[in-house]
Amino acid sequence: MMYHIPGVLSPQDVARFREQLEQAEWVDGRVTTGAQGAQVKNNQQVDTRSTLYAALQNEVLNAVNQHALFFAAALPRTLSTPLFNRYQNNETYGFHVDGAVRSHPQNGWMRTDLSATLFLSDPQSYDGGELVVNDTFGQHRVKLPAGDLVLYPSSSLHCVTPVTRGVRVASFIWIQSMIRDDKKRAMLFELDKNIQNIQSLKSRYGENEEILSLLNLYHNLLREWSEI
């Protein structure tokens, strides 16, 4: 399943990120991909050896970790170190699948269950640059407001179309979820949303056994399916 997570960064945060990224050192994006991906990848990434990169990636991690909707949809166990990319002058990234595992600075290795793109450019400021994701439900073309994030299975074929005007800047992350199976994770997310909707009526109708029963079901399923 694909999920739109709005407002991960505020407009003020986005403006500050963009100002700082203007000062960043950019390198060939192929430095972080394998041989197959390098054949279709043509973009730039912030140099991960820079002091600025260390500060920015920490801010992205803090933002996503504090976002309740992101947590509910992803149920993250491990987050990769965020990276930042830039597309301009017809740069693109052809169809590819993300690697199944990635190195992680604390855990050694992590499994990539989910991929996330956090948009940092106003969609009106550039042409092209859509994230195109193919999954079992068809093809999705994504171009979100700055500060919003899209979450999708890492097993999906996806690409970024050529940027023909302006500049597209984004951060991207991989997530190892506590729930490996996409279908089970989606069911838990739907159950969680329904529980939240019912709980919003609690002030009017008070606590009831139905809410407690659903909460019990959610946590028992999470306990049964999670890998910690």
From Swiss-Prot:
Gene3D superfamilies (alphabetical): q2cbj1_9rhob like domain, Rabenosyn, Rab binding domain
Record keywords: Dioxygenase, Iron, Metal-binding, Oxidoreductase, Vitamin C
Organism of derivation: Escherichia coli O157:H7
Domain Fe2OG dioxygenase: 78-177
Record: residues binding Fe cation: 96, 98, 158
GO MF term set: 2-oxoglutarate-dependent dioxygenase activity; iron ion binding; L-ascorbic acid binding
Protein name: PKHD-type hydroxylase YbiX
Enzyme class: oxidoreductase
Gene name for this UniProt entry: ybiX
Entry's EC annotation: 1.14.11.-
One Pfam family linked to the record: PKHD_C
Ion transport is among the record's keywords: no
Note accompanying the cofactor annotation: Binds 1 Fe(2+) ion per subunit.
Regions crossing the membrane: none
Residues annotated to bind 2-oxoglutarate: 168
Named cofactor requirement(s): Fe(2+); L-ascorbate
Any one of the GO BP annotations: DNA damage response
PANTHER family linked: PKHD-TYPE HYDROXYLASE YBIX
